[in-house]
Structure formats: structure tokens, C-alpha cells
Amino acid sequence: LRPSLHFLGVLVALASPCLADDWGTIRGKFTIGGKAPEASALKVDKDVEVCGKEKLLSEELVVGADGGIANVVVFVRDKDVKIHPDLKGAKDPVEMDNKACRFEPHVAFVQVGQPLKLKNSDTVGHNSNVATLKNPPTNSLIAAGADSTVTFTAEEAIPAQVTCNIHPWMKAWVLVRPN
């Protein structure tokens, strides 16, 4: 136990100046152990001529051939999280598209004050119902080929679900953070 604690102390001492002076990147991969469950087919029962062209699968758990899990959200909960100066106050809109009767991407990240452009590339109308806790909820009806933009003024403690009330199988998530 002592050699382990000694090594840990040296590691922390060496890492501390780097953490204080420099920026870093943390990369990781979430994987599933064993065989992943098969994605279930979604019941497409509205606008079938458009939404039923492709077999739509649930995106609740998306696992790659290597066992990697997609759409995992990891963030720091702290009042004083520093952000790299190049990333502060992001102004370019983040896009979430209604495409092939599903939301793309399935998970989006937006900074407080950064626009979220809800787009509809389909030939049928959709709505994007964003169920936030700290921001006023939005429920935009978006005609085929149109878009709507929303800007959140407060951070959200958890990802907000995005749904289409017209096509109930459509679900996605947006995380609004200050950093």
C-alpha cells in the first residue's frame, strides 16, 4: 500500500503544475462488456411514405462493432469550470436536423447563449419539443425544408429531451452548459 500511495503522491505533484498552467484534453471510450442487445425496430405509423422508407431503429443504446457505446454524455459539475479562451462564448449555431424522421445528431451540446438551430430536411412537417428544466420549454412546429432557432439563457443540470409530437418515435437530447 505504501509504494502505491508514494507513487500517487509523486503523480499528483507532477501533474499539478501542468493542470494549473496548461490546457489538456481528456479522451475516453465507453464500451459494453459481452454481447450488445439488438436495437429494436421503431413503430413508424405516421407519414409512412416518408418515414417508413428506411427501417428505423431505436437509438436508446447504440453499440459499434468494437463494443463502443455512442451518445454518452460526460460533463463536469462545478461552479468554477474554466473554459479554453478559444471556446468561450461560442456564437456559431449548433444544428439538430429532423432527417429521415429522426433527429440528427442524437445528442447535441450547446453553450448557454449559443443558438440551437432546429432544422427540418424532411418533406413532411415536424415539431421539436425541447423539455428543459431551467429554460422556457420550446415546441417549434417546423415545416418541410424550414428551421427554427432557440437560444438558452440558463445552464441545464441534465440533458433535455427533444421529441417530435407528430412522430412519437423521434427522440434526441440536448445538453446546455456554460462551458
Go through each PLM region and give its residues.
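Bacterial N-terminal signal peptides that target proteins for export
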Residues: L1-G9
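Sec/Tat signal peptide C-region and signal peptidase I cleavage site
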Residues: L14-A20
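Extracytoplasmic copper-binding redox domains, predominantly the cupredoxin/blue-copper superfamily
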Residues: A20-N179
